[in-house]
UniProtKB/Swiss-Prot annotation:
The keyword Nucleotide-binding applies. Its EC number is 6.3.2.2. It comes from Corynebacterium glutamicum (strain ATCC 13032 / DSM 20300 / JCM 1318 / BCRC 11384 / CCUG 27702 / LMG 3730 / NBRC 12168 / NCIMB 10025 / NRRL B-2784 / 534). One of its GO terms (biological process) is modified amino acid biosynthetic process. Keywords: ATP-binding, Ligase, Nucleotide-binding. It comes from the Bacteria. The lineage of its organism: Bacteria, Bacillati, Actinomycetota, Actinomycetes, Mycobacteriales. Belongs to the glutamate--cysteine ligase type 2 family. YbdK subfamily. It is an enzyme of class 6 (ligase). The keyword ATP-binding applies. This is Putative glutamate--cysteine ligase 2. One of its GO terms (molecular function) is ATP binding. Gene3D superfamilies: 3.30.590.20.
Amino acid sequence: MGIEFKRSPRPTLGVEWEIALVDPETRDLAPRAAEILEIVAKNHPEVHLEREFLQNTVELVTGVCDTVPEAVAELSHDLDALKEAADSLGLRLWTSGSHPFSDFRENPVSEKGSYDEIIARTQYWGNQMLIWGIHVHVGISHEDRVWPIINALLTNYPHLLALSASSPAWDGLDTGYASNRTMLYQQLPTAGLPYQFQSWDEWCSYMADQDKSGVINHTGSMHFDIRPASKWGTIEVRVADSTSNLRELSAIVALTHCLVVHYDRMIDAGEELPSLQQWHVSENKWRAARYGLDAEIIISRDTDEAMVQDELRRLVAQLMPLANELGCARELELVLEILERGGGYERQRRVFKETGSWKAAVDLACDELNDLKALD
């Protein structure tokens, strides 16, 4: 089973951002995405929105962009159109990695054959997917580069997750995790960490096996945390919890863009890309999901360890010259701002401890969507 990879001549960028609707009185999720899509399509036909797995969610999707500021500006414009539609229905926009108390039984799945198939196959766990994320696409020039870069990106998995983690609560309980979304999503049979394939042919062989065994027939595709998007000629990084605001999204997209281009240029220079044993990658994923920005992570094949905050500061300094070249230096600097402000999970947990109510945490995320704006 050969898979054609639509090669991208330059490291273009695309971003998908999942946003939910909430009732301002109950703070619970509101399954009214179909109405929102209709209003936006009528009033702002230039805005690209997609319906999502849940009827309470819409996805903002950029076009093909060359820079982080371009992608963020497009998302900002689309967010304004989405807010206008939500206001007209008396709803608020909200997003984080997961909702702190909503009941999956009150949140219907969108009407789509592939969604029905996923629920039929995965049952309880499929119904639990009250989760939201950010997907970042970066263009790759040749399929032979895809898996070396993905395997290198897996060494940065905990950095991206800790920075974005915003799902500390579930079913009204503090889970003790920074990203409960991460723990939930990996319950689906085609989700979670990718295998560290060593070549494009090996990936094609794997996908042929999944097709022959009926796995792809059931799910439509593999939903790995980082995966090739052959149709677009990109690597799609799906690690991050959804951020409650464009400002933090900007930082995560900038870091992702810089990392992919950095590893691509290492290939150009004939340098060996970093990698970790699969068990180290898995452990790092768990540590970042559990401890967020307080995680101590494994940084070498010799099992050396460091604090993820220190590693993030090191990465920002290392990547800053490249960020200047790519036009996203200011956005990359926002990584340091997140470290100072505290992660989304920390802010939600803090307001819950102050008020004793997860409704206040929902309000916080709604307010941040309005107040923590992208850079001018």
